[in-house]
């Protein structure tokens, strides 16, 4: 009997990608986040589709249409809560996935890593335009503040900002186009995910030890499908707990008020997953300098593969690099906290020091640690 799974043109691709895929036998739970991100994307697209059926992208009715979804649409409240908190879960998995890549040296698969960074930027853009759609106070002022950063670009800045707005300020045209962007971007993300996986198939997955695992491979199914299923259960448990028990925990109270261009909130801040970059932006007094630092805080991921100086790929057996990695993690948590604080002392100086430390760790200390560890491993007799 012919095995359709291995012969059918379409099934064959799925089989080689998810069933008979040779996987390293020692990959840990840190490798679960790729599949978790895939499920997050599916949840976001499916809940988003149902929300788009009832949402109206008009400044007069956007806020009330979201209220209508929660009050009058059948199960609208759970769809909206899953979508809003699903974004937080998405970014949580993204940050852990990137952290794992840095810790275990997965960034040395340069093509996969670079597509991953492009994916991160696309997801951030999608989340930003999505946050504007409910047209609450923080939606409106967040959109005004972030799009206004474009005006810091010399010569073309103001023209560019007005082109994005579709007028002289954030208004109806802006909301309509942001809804269009928010609808199309997840499908672009899906295409990029396929490219990300294609590049990963070329090299095979990395593993905690960082050494070539070709001599010891096992099939992806059933070993890692079961393991991923456990990770997905945890993901869904946290997501459902958030959506059902405290759906507004990660939101901003200001967004319960309709957008009012005449009333500025006392403290404009983005969602929690952008706060680290927002803190870096705020730590530089100059507008253009802040925008460049904001971009650098994300694009620095692209230079990490070129800063790898250690002879070993993974940090598993490199205690100095491990220490620096966990300092970087603590530093990012500090930046996230500072980004949510009002602009006053001591928050300003803490933010500036944490921003300097962020770039110093990645650009200077981690490459130096790799070189020092190489020296320590050299035989001295």
UniProtKB/Swiss-Prot annotation:
GO-annotated cellular components: mitochondrial inner membrane; respiratory chain complex III
Membrane protein topology class: Multi-pass membrane protein
KW Transmembrane helix (keyword) present: yes
Disulfide bonds: none
Free-text remark on how the cofactor is bound: Binds 2 heme b groups non-covalently.
Subunit structure: The cytochrome bc1 complex contains 11 subunits: 3 respiratory subunits (MT-CYB, CYC1 and UQCRFS1), 2 core proteins (UQCRC1 and UQCRC2) and 6 low-molecular weight proteins (UQCRH/QCR6, UQCRB/QCR7, UQCRQ/QCR8, UQCR10/QCR9, UQCR11/QCR10 and a cleavage product of UQCRFS1). This cytochrome bc1 complex then forms a dimer.
Function recorded in the entry: Component of the ubiquinol-cytochrome c reductase complex (complex III or cytochrome b-c1 complex) that is part of the mitochondrial respiratory chain. The b-c1 complex mediates electron transfer from ubiquinol to cytochrome c. Contributes to the generation of a proton gradient across the mitochondrial membrane that is then used for ATP synthesis.
Protein name: Cytochrome b
Chain's gene name: MT-CYB
